[in-house]
């Protein structure tokens, strides 16, 4: 099946966990009295025991009212108490996943009634234990994603093995137009929001604060954990309400995601307005209140039209599909642009780990660009959100600092080690035809920096400069491990976006994992969950980012500390104050 370039963003961000779902869905519930149960105000939750890993799992626990009918596109509403003290919630199977382009497996049902979460704890955990809590926010470009595809069994088991047991929670939230729809009618409505998906996450965190103690978790030791759009969600949550997280979480791990999902728009931006109207027209809404009509439309039809809008964007990133369903600056939850609020210190002051893969852009780079003129047209359509007097100067700096020089493109040079395959800058070494294009490597470098690397640096700059208040320590890394297949070769994309996921979730994908890194990464994360310091249990050097801007190079037998100085001039050109306005940062 040939996918349009833009939809690759969705598939790459979600497919990293597809295979990992299978071990979980094979679990069988213990229907006897020995099945684990937890009493909540909404009923008694009955889970299942997993003797293979020594865990107890509770799947599909509702945390909000179903967002259907008049609640479609609205902020999530909390659940009330159970109607009867005999109410039993069957948590032995996954809940429905949220509406999206395609379900990751036919084993999962997709519906709007998807606001549920999963809890995994060590076997025998009681309310007296008060274990630290790790909360997973999935990625998927804000258009895909679900909790079942991430199997945390080994991670929780690892925590038990090293004597630092944790409770793991995964929150489901709305994506696509159901979670991130804009338009003037949405912005002007008292009953709808452009950031329903972010509000879902926050209500899920409120549920955790009120209920996780019953599962043996400590509500005062909650760490958020996310990758890609999940990491971006966490950054936005740290940034939301002018940096007020209301004590719902206390630390964060953000892998391959920064303060913004590329450009940030407002609900009334012409691109967003166009997407709203095209969605409404696509389901037959042409007059009167389009919002009211959209709420009455069949959910599957809404999703189909939304998916088609994205696909129709073809090879031009973004517009209209790619920017159609993203978090927006709504001036309520997201009160202003990062370039405005961060210098004022409006960021949650909590410990953070934040990092990227070496070649973040290779999964998304444009394969149809044949010349510098093509590249420049693509960047103009991709990056310019607000035309200002600085627009042309900003673009010329981009063209200059991301040159038509293959040696400076991505995949970037990456030296071979005993467990990590090499990536060279020689075009002739690329075995997959699109990767032999100068413009492919150029666009991969630009996209990776524009969407991921520059956003990471923006966040870390705000967190470490201590603008007005920030004092918590932060750590950063770059994942450079290019795992080898049985024949000794690695991915032709280099250490690509999502290549690190199998180091903390189960994902049998036919490649070898470096055993040292496979122990070190989860150990560092568990250490961070317990101590807000990744080195306490790790036994290796990893200094805080700080003024020295130090990164941990994660690379099998060559894990070492490096300086975060690569492509500095180029990324500064993307994020300086004048450029930030042009590019919507």
Curated annotation (Swiss-Prot):
Disulfide bonds: 98-114, 285-293
Temperature effects on activity: Optimum temperature is 37 degrees Celsius.
EC number: 3.1.1.42
SUPFAM superfamilies cross-referenced by the UniProt entry: alpha/beta-Hydrolases
Key words, A-Z: Disulfide bond, Glycoprotein, Hydrolase, Secreted, Signal
UniProt GO MF annotations: chlorogenate hydrolase activity
Annotated localization: Secreted
GO CC annotations on file: extracellular region
Class of the enzyme per the UniProt entry, highest EC level: hydrolase
Glycosylation sites recorded in the entry for this protein: 109, 151, 298, 308, 370, 387, 487, 558
Annotated signal sequence range: 1-21
UniProt entry tagged with the keyword Glycoprotein: yes
A Pfam family of this chain: COesterase
pH-dependence annotation: Optimum pH is 7.5.
Transmembrane regions listed in the UniProt entry: none
Catalytic activity: chlorogenate + H2O = L-quinate + (E)-caffeate + H(+)
Catalytic residues (UniProt): 228, 360
Main location: secreted
Assembly mode: Monomer.
Similarity comment text for this entry: Belongs to the type-B carboxylesterase/lipase family.
Function (record text): Extracellular chlorogenic acid esterase that displays a surprisingly broad substrate profile. The enzyme's unique properties may contribute to the specific environmental interaction between the pathogenic fungus and its host, Zea mays. Additionally, the release of caffeic, p-coumaric, and ferulic acids from agroindustrial by-products such as destarched wheat bran (DSWB) and coffee pulp (CP) renders this enzyme an attractive candidate for the generation of natural aroma precursors and antioxidants.
Name used for this protein in its record: Chlorogenic acid esterase
Species, as recorded: Mycosarcoma maydis
């Amino acid at each position: 099946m040939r996918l349009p370039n833009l939809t690759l963003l969705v598939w790459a961000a979600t497919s990293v966990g597809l295979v990992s779902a299978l071990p979980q869905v094979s679990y069988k519930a213990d229907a006897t009295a020995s099945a684990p149960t937890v009493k909540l105000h909404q009923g008694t939750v009955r889970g299942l025991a997993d003797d293979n890993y020594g865990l107890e799992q509770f799947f599909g626990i509702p945390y909000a009212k179903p967002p259907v009918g008049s609640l479609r596109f609205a902020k999530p509403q909390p659940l009330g108490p159970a109607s009867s003290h005999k109410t039993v919630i069957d948590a032995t199977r996954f809940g429905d996943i949220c509406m999206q382009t395609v379900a990751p497996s036919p084993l999962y049902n997709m519906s709007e009634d998807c606001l549920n979460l999963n809890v995994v704890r060590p076997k025998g955990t009681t309310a007296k234990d008060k274990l630290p809590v790790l909360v997973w926010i999935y990625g998927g470009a804000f258009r895909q994603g679900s909790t079942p595809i991430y199997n945390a069994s080994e991670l929780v088991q690892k925590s038990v093995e090293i004597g630092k047991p944790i409770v793991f929670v995964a929150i489901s939230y709305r994506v696509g137009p159901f979670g991130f729809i804009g338009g003037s009618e949405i912005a002007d409505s008292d009953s709808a929001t452009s950031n329903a998906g972010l509000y879902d996450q926050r209500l899920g965190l409120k549920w955790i604060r009120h209920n996780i103690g019953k599962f043996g978790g400590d509500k005062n030791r909650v760490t958020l954990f996310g990758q890609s759009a999940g990491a971006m969600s966490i950054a936005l949550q740290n940034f939301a309400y002018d940096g007020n997280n209301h004590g719902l979480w206390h630390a964060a791990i953000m892998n391959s995601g920064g303060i913004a999902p590329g450009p940030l728009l407002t609900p009334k931006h012409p691109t967003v307005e166009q997407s709203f109207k095209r969605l409404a027209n696509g389901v037959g809404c042409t007059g009167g209140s389009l919002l009211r009509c959209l709420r009455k439309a069949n959910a599957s039809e809404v999703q189909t039209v939304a998916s088609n809008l994205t696909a129709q964007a073809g090879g031009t990133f973004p517009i209209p599909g790619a920017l159609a369903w993203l978090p927006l600056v709504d001036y309520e939850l997201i009160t202003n642009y990062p370039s405005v609020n961060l210098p004022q210190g409006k960021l949650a002051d909590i410990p953070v780990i934040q990092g990227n893969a070496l070649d973040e852009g290779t999964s998304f780079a444009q394969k149809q660009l044949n010349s510098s003129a093509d590249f420049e047209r693509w960047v103009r359509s991709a990056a310019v959100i607000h035309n200002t007097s600085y627009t042309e100067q900003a673009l010329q700096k981009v063209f200059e600092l991301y040159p038509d020089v293959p040696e400076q493109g991505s995949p970037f040079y990456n030296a071979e080690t005993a467990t990590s395959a090499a990536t060279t800058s020689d075009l002739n070494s690329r075995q997959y035809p699109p990767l032999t294009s100068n413009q492919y490597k150029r666009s991969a470098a630009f996209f990776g920096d524009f969407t991921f690397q520059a956003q990471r640096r923006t966040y870390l700059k705000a967190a470490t400069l201590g603008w007005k208040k920030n004092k918590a320590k932060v750590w950063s890394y770059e994942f450079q491990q290019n795992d080898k297949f049985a024949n000794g070769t690695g991915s032709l994309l280099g250490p690509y976006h999502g290549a690190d996921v199998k180091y903390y979730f189960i994902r049998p994908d036919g490649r070898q994992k470096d055993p040292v890194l496979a122990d070190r990464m989860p150990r560092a994360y568990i250490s961070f969950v317990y101590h807000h310091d990744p080195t306490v249990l790790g036994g290796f050097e990893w200094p805080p980012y700080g003024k020295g801007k130090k990164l941990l190079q994660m690379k099998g037998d060559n894990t070492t500390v490096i300086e975060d100085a690569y492509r500095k001039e180029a990324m500064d050109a993307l994020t300086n104050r004048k450029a930030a306005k042009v590019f919507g940062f």
